Amino acid sequence: MKCPFCGFADTRVIDSRLGKEGNNIRRRRECSQCERRFTTFERVEDMLPLIIKKDARRQPFDRKKVIGGIQRACEKRPVSIATIEKIVDTLERQLQESGEREIESKIIGQAVMDALHDLDQVAYVRFASVYRQFKDINEFMAELKDILAEGGNVRDN
């Protein structure tokens, strides 16, 4: 592997460890020329399906894009980045286990909405408003009424 510091092509592995969840390997390497050390990670390439967009375009699943959408919905809410990453990890696992080569974007959007619905109702409504493209306040109100009918609560601040 090429050294990130000097660009020399010969490095040696000085330590290898299995990652916490057993799905990656952490390696400490040392450059044979400059003798500096660096870390690399190895993991099995995910075989995620292509995403079919509303306009029928196909594109690879983009974990960062999904995390970004959830983060925007959870902005200023008590939801940690670790929780958001768990949602996306679960989604990726479901996509892999489905065995599908292509999947519609609406299935991903619905899975995120389901996860947010159970996690944080404000984040859920924010995400739903973008995902479902609410046009006016009446659509917001209809969604809020559904949440309240399911046993959600509104508290006074």
From Swiss-Prot:
The keyword Phosphoprotein does not apply. It comes from the Bacteria. A zinc finger (unnamed) spans 3-34. Keywords: ATP-binding, DNA-binding, Metal-binding, Nucleotide-binding, Repressor, Transcription, Transcription regulation, Zinc, Zinc-finger. The keyword ATP-binding applies. GO terms for molecular function: ATP binding; DNA binding; zinc ion binding. Pfam families: ATP-cone, Zn_ribbon_NrdR. PROSITE patterns: ATP_CONE. GO terms for biological process: negative regulation of DNA-templated transcription. Binds 1 zinc ion. InterPro entries: ATP-cone_dom, NrdR-like_N, RNR_NrdR-like. Its cofactor is Zn(2+). Residues 49-139 form the ATP-cone domain. Signal peptide: none annotated. Negatively regulates transcription of bacterial ribonucleotide reductase nrd genes and operons by binding to NrdR-boxes. Belongs to the NrdR family. This is Transcriptional repressor NrdR. It comes from Syntrophotalea carbinolica (strain DSM 2380 / NBRC 103641 / GraBd1) (Pelobacter carbinolicus).
